[in-house]
Amino acid sequence: MYAVGVVGLVSFVLLERRMADAALLPVKLFRIRAFRLGTVLHFTVGITMFGAMTTLPLYLQLAKGMSPMKAGLATLPTMAANVTVTLVVGRLMSRTGRFKVHLVAGVGSLTVAMLVFATLRDDSPLWYVAIGMVFMGAGLGAAMQTITTLAQSEVPGRDMGAATASVNFFRSNGGTVGAAAFLSILFSLAGSRISERVAVASQDASFRRLAGEPANAEALKGVLRPDGGVNLEDSAFLRHLDPGVAQPFLEGYVSALRVVFLTGAAVGLIAFVIAAWRVPNTQLSAD
């Protein structure tokens, strides 16, 4: 599968070079420094954004017992902050012609959001989760439009459409990578983290008594393997467990989620360093 991907990528690049100005993704654009920086930033921010948007609702469903619909509605602070900051930053850029300060602030805010999420516990209050959501929405509102502006800033007018489509393409690809990578990290770690906590909890007599009750034993059927492992194909069993029995499962899930968000913070930090130290502090012309 990886070999097919590499061959496809190489073939695509060679074909695009051959097509020159008629290419879907003109290779000549990558000679422009601002465009290169824009694609890298869109890719890294896409990883963080889509990775967080994929895994945060899982936290709300598992740790807070929300339905998928309620979990989606609970993320409204992200959208509210996004829309507000997008409008404000757009006006400020139009007035001053400066975009770097908003870009750096946006990527920094997104990184702070990941760090807030990385400190979540299964009993964290919703207002604390909402703080992270506001940072994330504000960061995306400030970063997305300024990254696009950066990528367009040195591109000739005739290539503006191709440049805009290209940076959005890289953001989408970053999102695909982020969602896949974050979920892979989550489910590769969750099993072992849960097993460790269940093993510790099983040393307590009250936990063994609760787990042995008919309703809990039925819910755990097929979840706990004889070798001590855990099957995580479906987390719906948590809704049928006594809270005392569900606790080690929730702690294991959230522990794995914290690693996911720390990974997102690391990617966000890379984007922040690029934005702060590589992006020039230029002023856009009125044209």
Residue spans for each PLM region:
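Small-residue-rich alpha-helical segments with characteristic i,i+4
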Residues: 52, 75, 129-215, 276
